[in-house]
Regions:
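Structural motif
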Residues: 61, 103, 153-154, 179
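A short, gly/pro- and small-residue-rich
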Residues: 49-58, 165-185
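Short, flexible loop segments at boundaries between secondary-structure elements
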Residues: 135-139, 176-206
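Conserved beta-alpha
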Residues: 70-151
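Short glycine-rich anion-binding loops that position phosphate/pyrophosphate groups of nucleotides
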Residues: 38-41, 159-164, 186
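A short helix->loop->beta-strand "cap" motif at the edges of active sites that frequently abuts
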Residues: 31, 102, 175-178
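Proline-aspartate-enriched helix->loop->beta-strand connector
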Residues: 151-156, 161, 177
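N-terminal nucleotide/polyanion-binding subdomain common to many enzyme families
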Residues: 1-82
Length: 206
């Protein structure tokens, strides 16, 4: 299947527009699964039927995380506004959840990283319920059952592409609500364990 079929599914609006859409789902208790599309997951879709189905599913919200995705859409004359990075989206969603006193589950990264992020969130938003588990468990599906039991409002999974997306997809039917997003290495940045590149380099992917 041509890459352009996946690109047609990508959200065309601004980062702010998408944050409003995701924030509405968070506030109203809707279910929203977000996939941050970069060249890696688009290429993997060519050889993986599960990823292909996920990207083409009308229920999946796909955003352009990667300047090359934005440029490819422009070359194909597909509507697109700007790059929407996973780390920016994760930060906005966490802030929205904190302000609304929603519950959050963080899965992935090293213990010291994910625990530092959880502590940081609790300090900033004392009324937000934060649960977490590192990404080194041998049975990720068993780990995810803990999330199913908790039924949180926001779930961030940092296990890398495409493992994080496929894991969420396998269990999504067990949730009545929640915003779900795979965030790759974002916990390192969000926790303060790793500095992020200046905004100019993020926007231009240089």
């Amino acid at each position: 299947m041509a890459i352009q079929e996946y690109l047609r599914r990508v959200f065309p609006g601004s980062a702010e527009d998408f944050c409003q859409k995701a924030g509405k789902a968070l506030q109203e208790g809707d279910k929203l699964f977000v996939v941050t599309a970069n060249p890696e997951i688009l290429m993997k879709a060519e050889g993986n039927a599960e990823i292909r189905r996920l990207l083409l599913d009308e229920e999946t919200a796909v955003v352009p995380d990667g300047i090359s995705v934005v440029r490819a859409m422009q070359q194909l004359f597909l509507p697109v506004t700007e790059r929407i990075t996973g780390v920016d989206l994760a930060q906005r969603l966490l802030d929205m959840a904190g302000q609304a006193e929603k519950s959050v589950y963080l899965l992935g990264a090293k213990e010291e990283v994910v625990s530092a992020l959880a502590k940081k969130l609790k300090l900033r938003y004392p009324r937000m319920e934060v649960r977490y588990k590192n990404g080194y468990g041998k049975d990720k599906d068993a780990d995810f059952q803990e999330i199913v039991q908790a039924q949180p409002d926001l779930v961030l999974v940092a296990l890398g592409v495409p493992a994080q997306e496929l894991l969420i997809a396998r269990h999504l039917d067990q949730f009545q609500k929640g915003v779900f997003i795979g965030v790759g290495g974002s916990f390192d940045v969000l926790s303060g364990s790793k500095r992020r590149a200046p905004s100019f380099f993020v926007k231009t992917n240089t």
